[in-house]
Every structure is written in C-alpha cells, then in structure tokens.
Amino acid sequence: MSTLKEQLTAHVASYDHWAQRRRYGPDGHNNRSLWVLACMDERLPVDEALGIHVDTPAGGGDAHCFRNAGGIVTDDAIRSAMLTCNFFGTKEIVIVQHTQCGMLSGNANEMEKVLREKGMDTDNITLDPTLPELQLAKGAFAKWIGMMDDVDETCMKTINAFKNHPLIPKDIVVSGWVWEVENRRLRAPTLDKEKRARTDCTPTPYGVKGNQPPRWK
C-alpha cells in the first residue's frame, strides 16, 4: 500500500499536469482528443447534448469547446480548429447547432441596414484591430454576419467546410448534429423535414422576409 505522502504527491502532480497539459503538445490532449464547435446560445447544453464533460475542471476536460453565434464556420473557428488538430492532439471535430436559433431571427441585409443607420461604415470595417490585414471585401458584410435560412442545411455546410479545409488534416473525424431545444433531443442534420421532430427550423416563424445573403447555399 502506498503511503499518504505518495498519494498526495500523485494527486498534486495530476493537477500540475492539468494546468500544464497544453505544454505537452499532442501528448497533452484533452480526455477525448475532441474539439467541439457549438452555438453560444444558453439553450444549448453541450455536456447534456453530447453526453460528455466539457465545462468544469472538476468533472470536465473531455474537449476543447469553441462557441460562437450559430456554431458556424468562421475565420477564428478555423484558426482554433487548426491549432487543436495540428498541435494539441485533437482527432475529432463535433459541430452542434440547434433549432429556434437566434441566427434565424432576422435578415442579414436588414441588420446591416440598421448598423448603417447607426453610423457604422460596414464597407470599411477592421475585423481585428490587431490584424488590420484581415479585411472584408466591399459588400460582404451581410454575408459575414452568417444568418441562416435553415439550421440543418447550415450544419451540413459547416461539416463540409471543415472536412475540405486545407488547414484541417484529412484524418480528422468530422460530424455535425442538431439539438432540438423544444424536446431536448439530439439528431443528425437532415433536409427531410419528416425526419425532424420539429419542422420550424427555418426563419418562417420569425416573420423574416427574403432569403439571407448566399453564404450557405
């Protein structure tokens, strides 16, 4: 039987490893070698949806988790995925989007119009003040916002974007899922509305007029 000193030494070492695990590169990966991209919405409980533990050091550590509006592919999502897949031992990417998403609730062209009325020049925006080289082409702002016409279609496009991106290794497993907030059910994305427990996964219930800029088509 080990002494208490030995047990405590191992216990402290485990916390040191936890705190410094990024220093180990691929050998310091998270518990499941997993990177999760999810919508930032508070109605999407990543741990419950995926059956893993992400959020707390006490019971977490299963994945790196990146959340943004919509859980969509963006330049910073690609940057984070590139780092975790190439340098931190990640072997799998899981994308989680959800029904009743706020990214369905408005038309991006109208949203840009509102910003212009507030005096913002959306044709001359520095996306990252520390990287002024990163610029949007004139007229691309509404598309950049990333509003959706259909959650399932967007989820499938996001999956393909990561599968085909040159900065993501080809052996990375990529999958995407839709969380139905109405009944707390996870399912695969589908264009067959008969296979959706809910069919109001489009902007129609919000009264959105006109299609979004063609980012996801």
UniProtKB/Swiss-Prot annotation:
The EC number(s) this enzyme carries: 3.13.1.5
Sequence segments annotated as region (Disordered): 192-217
SMART domains associated with the record: Pro_CA (SM00947)
Catalytic reactions of this protein: carbon disulfide + 2 H2O = 2 hydrogen sulfide + CO2 + 2 H(+)
Subunit structure: Forms only homooctamers in solution.
Family statement drawn from the similarity comment of this UniProt entry: Belongs to the beta-class carbonic anhydrase family.
Function text: Catalyzes the conversion of carbon disulfide into hydrogen sulfide and carbon dioxide, with carbonyl sulfide as an intermediate. Likely plays a key role in sulfur metabolism that allows A.thiooxidans S1p to grow on carbon disulfide as the main carbon and energy source. Does not show carbonic anhydrase activity (hydration of CO(2) to carbonate).
Name this polypeptide is given: Carbon disulfide hydrolase
